A protein has these predicted regions:
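Carbohydrate-associated surface elements
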Residues: 58, 79
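Short hydrophobic beta-strand element within catalytic cores of glycosyltransferases
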Residues: 195, 200, 204-207, 217, ...
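Short donor-sugar binding/catalytic loops of nucleotide-sugar-dependent glycosyltransferases
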Residues: 102-106, 121, 136, 161
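A short, histidine- and acid-enriched strand-loop-helix "catalytic/donor-clamping" loop
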Residues: 2-5, 13, 18-36, 48-51
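Acidic donor-binding loop of glycosyltransferase active sites
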Residues: 171-187, 203
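Nucleotide-activated donor-binding/catalytic signature segment of Leloir-type glycosyltransferases, i.e.
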Residues: 141-164
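Conserved donor-binding/catalytic core segment of Leloir-type glycosyltransferases
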Residues: 53, 91-109, 115-118, 131
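Short alpha-helical donor nucleotide-sugar binding micro-motif in glycosyltransferases
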Residues: 160-161, 168-173
Length: 228
């Protein structure tokens, strides 16, 4: 979104030429802070820009409600490199159950919810191991929660891993977990690419009825979705 605003201004100044297509992904069309700052400029972009490319039907509808002409909107889905995330051989669930999340460690990824769920699983005597791959501003908060619930023996946070290591860990996993939620400032997902990669590999996914996720995961058929 904001990049399109900048491009439109540069074209108006004669710095660049050509048509302007603007992608709307997630935070740029959901965060109250971003919208409070950019909504007036988005209105100008809707008039002056050539094409708006929201990554979900949900965002397409929101753009229309914000005043963008329908004829300037085309949903442009994100994709996955299938040469890197090819289907793995079918595997039976392991004991303990291997659960994995790959995400930037922010509020909207809902990993605090995942850790709470792990606390309940451990109390119920379920044998599992949970890996959270990624870095981000919520790392300290999540580690503190793990310590508070005494889950250090079942939850591992190895940080950032290169894509080939992520793929190897996905191949070993039994469940991909991403309980996305709406952040306190309204920040929402678009459609998480990490979910697409897990599905491309062939891992059962568990996520939430959040933003564009139901456009990717067909509930009870290609994965399990629960309310935020």
């Amino acid at each position: 979104g904001p990049a399109g605003v900048t491009a439109a201004k540069l074209r108006e100044l004669g710095v660049i030429r050509g048509k302007i297509a603007t992608i709307f992904h997630g935070i740029d069309i959901s965060s109250r802070e971003v919208l409070n700052h950019y909504t007036p400029e988005y209105q100008q972009l809707f008039r002056r820009g050539d094409l708006m490319l929201p990554i979900s039907n949900l965002w397409a509808g929101r753009l229309q409600k914000m005043g963008c002409p329908r004829e300037k909107i085309a949903v442009s889905r994100m994709g996955v490199d299938m040469t890197r995330f090819s289907p793995r051989p079918v595997k039976a669930p392991a004991t303990p159950l291997e659960i994995i999340s790959v995400a930037r460690l922010t509020e909207k990824k809902g990993l605090h919810v995942a850790i709470e769920a792990c606390r309940q699983l451990k109390e119920q005597g379920v044998a599992f191991r949970y890996r959270i791959l990624g870095i981000g501003p919520w790392e300290r908060r999540l580690r503190t929660l793990i310590e508070q619930y005494q889950l250090e023996d079942v939850i591992e946070m190895p940080g950032f891993k290169p894509s080939h290591e992520v793929k190897a860990m996905l191949d070993d996993a039994d469940v991909f977990l991403l309980p996305s939620v709406t952040g306190a400032d309204g920040d929402m997902e678009g459609i998480p690419v990490a979910l697409m990669e897990a599905m491309a590999v062939g891992i059962p996914v568990v996520s939430t009825l959040h933003s564009g996720i139901p456009e990717l995961v067909e509930a009870d058929k290609s994965g399990w979705l629960v309310p935020e």
